[in-house]
């Protein structure tokens, strides 16, 4: 075979090779040269590229990736998110009065569905809802994460500490912004780049292992936070009496007669405030409060303390979370697991 013919064959093979390669997609260009775990979400409006925080929120990312790749038991061997829709969208593009977020990942398509299990939150201080393009878990309260997620249009700081942030948009925020309710998630492709990312697997075994680790981590964090809170309460309200229920109280004005007890109609003046002295409610804002003691109308700790008071008595009381608003908190003002204080005065008893 002569040299000229060999040269022609080589040139032809090079041309075929070049011509046969599809150009790199815009989504892949956005993450070219970057290490990490990424999700390319093909939607009715175009592609959204998400970087997943697999080192900071390993359980949540394992859940998302494992469902997307069909490797978790709940996915039944099929890509879980492919073909689902964005069932809840609040944005100007959707015809709403404000921009908020797009939400998807529900196989029921109405906000009630999930993978058939729930898992705990993974809150990380540096991962917050700071602006557009934050990928976060939708939930129905503490420890109720499943498959639903949302992506923000704007900063939503009121969701910090309530929803787990586990990723961010690195390309395609314009697609997020024009997504409308009912638009499809056609396909989710997981891309791993770099040695660490390529070693990150998301099988059912991985999920189960990380679930145990997160539960233990959260348990220790809760214990430490509780210990610090008790120390702060006892320092702030030094000299208070502590009841067996864990309520702290100080009588600031003695009352008259017998203790009120249960099934009495009482009227009280009050001021409620957090441990940072932020007032969340006060009878100064409206009329004094009238209720029947032991009637299930009030939070337990407040009711217990008023029953123990006398007419015209004043107390400062500090209630533990389990006798106040618990894990859920209240009104977007009282955080979950918060100690709260009241200044209370009984002004009428029937």
Which positions does each model-derived feature cover?
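Bacterial N-terminal signal peptides
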Residues: 8-17
């Amino acid at each position: 075979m002569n040299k000229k013919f060999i040269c022609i064959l080589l040139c032809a093979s090079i041309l075929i090779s070049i011509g046969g390669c599809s150009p790199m997609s815009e989504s892949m260009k956005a993450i070219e040269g970057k290490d990490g775990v990424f999700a390319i979400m093909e939607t009715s409006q175009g592609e959204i590229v998400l970087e997943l925080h697999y080192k900071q929120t390993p359980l949540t990312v394992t859940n998302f990736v494992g469902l997307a790749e069909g490797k978790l038991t709940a996915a039944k061997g099929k890509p879980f998110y492919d073909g689902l829709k964005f069932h809840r969208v609040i944005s100007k593009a959707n015809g709403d009065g404000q921009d908020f977020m797009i939400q998807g990942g529900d196989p029921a398509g109405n906000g009630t569905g999930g993978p058939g299990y729930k898992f705990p939150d993974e809150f990380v201080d540096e991962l917050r809802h700071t602006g557009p393009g934050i990928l976060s878990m939708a939930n129905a309260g503490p420890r109720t994460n499943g498959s639903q997620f949302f992506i923000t249009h704007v900063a939503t700081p009121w969701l910090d500490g309530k929803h787990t942030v586990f990723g961010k948009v690195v390309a395609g925020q314009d697609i997020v912004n024009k997504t409308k309710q009912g638009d499809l998630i056609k396909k989710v492709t997981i891309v791993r780049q770099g040695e660490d990312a390529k070693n990150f697997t998301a099988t059912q075994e991985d999920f189960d292992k990380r679930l145990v680790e997160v539960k233990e981590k959260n348990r220790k964090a809760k214990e430490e936070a509780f210990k610090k809170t008790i120390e702060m309460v006892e320092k702030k309200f030094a000299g208070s009496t502590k009841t067996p229920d864990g309520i702290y109280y100080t009588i600031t004005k003695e009352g008259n007669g017998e203790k009120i007890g249960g099934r009495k109609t009482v009227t009280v003046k009050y001021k409620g405030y957090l441990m940072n002295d932020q007032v969340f409610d006060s009878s100064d804002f409206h009329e004094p409060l009238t209720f029947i003691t032991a009637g299930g109308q009030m939070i337990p700790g407040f009711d217990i303390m008023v029953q123990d008071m006398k007419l015209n008595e004043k107390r400062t009381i500090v209630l533990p979370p389990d006798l106040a608003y618990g894990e859920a908190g209240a009104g977007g003002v009282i955080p979950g697991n918060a100690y709260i204080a009241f200044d209370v005065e009984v002004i009428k008893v029937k």
